[in-house]
Amino acid sequence: MLKPLGDRVVLKVEEREQKVGGFVIAGAGQDATKTAKVIAVGEGIRTLNGELVAPSVKADDTVLVESHAGIEVKDGEEKYLVVNETNILAIVE
């Protein structure tokens, strides 16, 4: 399992399917955002005074993230996206 450092967040992106003429095109489109599930969260980031600022998201949250943000990584057969918390736009409720 991946354990992110600092203000980084590990996400599992929800793949969207688009149908065109009866064919399913996985991941099609040029959306500006992606929906993802938070898998793991770093401890946060420290201020110049050394105070720890906790992340705004937690494991199992569903979030909206910028589509081109982060780095795709593999852990075994699973693909994850590691982003900075600042790339997360909103928590989906």
Swiss-Prot record:
NCBIfam families: PRK00364.1-4 (NF001528)
Gene coding for it: groES
Keywords assigned by UniProt, alphabetized: Chaperone, Cytoplasm
Organism: Streptococcus constellatus
UniProt key word Cytoplasm: yes
Pfam entry (one): Cpn10
CDD domains: cpn10
GO process annotations (BP): chaperone cofactor-dependent protein refolding
Compartment list: Cytoplasm
Assembly and interaction partners: Heptamer of 7 subunits arranged in a ring. Interacts with the chaperonin GroEL.
Protein function: Together with the chaperonin GroEL, plays an essential role in assisting protein folding. The GroEL-GroES system forms a nano-cage that allows encapsulation of the non-native substrate proteins and provides a physical environment optimized to promote and accelerate protein folding. GroES binds to the apical surface of the GroEL ring, thereby capping the opening of the GroEL channel.
UniProt-listed Gene3D superfamilies: GroES chaperonin
Protein name per its UniProtKB record: Co-chaperonin GroES
Cellular component per GO, a single term: cytoplasm
Protein origin, superkingdom: Bacteria
Predominant place of localization: cytoplasm
Statement: the UniProt record of this protein carries the keyword Acetylation: no
Family: Belongs to the GroES chaperonin family.
GO molecular function: ATP binding; metal ion binding; protein folding chaperone; protein-folding chaperone binding; unfolded protein binding
